Every structure is written in C-alpha cells, then in structure tokens.
Amino acid sequence: MVAIVIVAAVASSAVVVAVASTTAAGLPSYTNGYQKWPKINKKPFTKCGPPCAHGGVKNVYANKKKVGARYPNGTVIVKSIAQAGDKPSRPNQVAVMRKVAGRWKYIEYQLSGSRYTVLAQGQLCQSCHARAKANDYVFTKR
C-alpha cells in the first residue's frame, strides 16, 4: 500500500486529508517499498528444498548488493511468497532477513486477513540457512 499524507493548517487546526502506510500491515518498517528493490532472482521461481520452508511462487529482493562474498550490515532481504494464481503484489507469506552487527536476523510472516503475523523466526530459520553458509546464508544467488 502506498502512502500519502497531506496536512492542511486551517485557523490553528490541522486537517488530515489522507493517511496510509507504506508498509503492509504487520511488516516491519525497514521493509518499506521492498517490491521496488533489485531482485536477486531473474524471474519468479518455485524450486524449494529439501526441506521446503517456503513453498509457492517466490521473488527475492535485497536493499543492498554483496560486497565481495558477503552482504554488508544493514542489508535487508525480503522473499515474497505467493500461491499460484494469487497476486504477486499481495504475497501470502513474506520471509525477511536483516543483517545486524555481522549476523542475520530472520523472521517469516503469514498473511492473516489483511494483516501479516509472525509465522516463524530466529533459530528455526537459522538452522536451515546454515546450509547456505558459503553464500552468506542466502540461498538465492544473483
């Protein structure tokens, strides 16, 4: 959802004309606009696993490029996961990796109604991503 906030001052009172958020409800603000970030994958893909934690049609976006073999601190990687036939702009799952102080933080969200809620996070995600250590714990390659 794209946001525009317009405020008009009228005789010492403010009137909000339109308010919306640039983040889908429930997703962290640091993922704002992720669908406009460069994609890591060339085209949507369905390949998964084993084991398969993210089944569906996937696109992977990163806000920063690798520096050598590693992603820099502050990198956010978002994997949007839609089921076949669903709108890619409204994925039913969103997996997020965020690099802080040299370590990845993981969290996966599930669409529940009009809001994303936490599905999995932390060690559960990290144990699987350990298999991609050679690519800085990221399975998808450019």
Language model regions located:
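Signal peptide processing junction and immediate N-terminal pro/mature segment
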Residues: A14-S21
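Sequence context surrounding c-type heme c attachment/ligation sites in exported
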Residues: S21-A53, K64-R142
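Bacterial N-terminal signal peptides
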Residues: V2-A14
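A Trp-anchored, charged/polar loop motif used as the substrate-binding/catalytic surface
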Residues: Y61
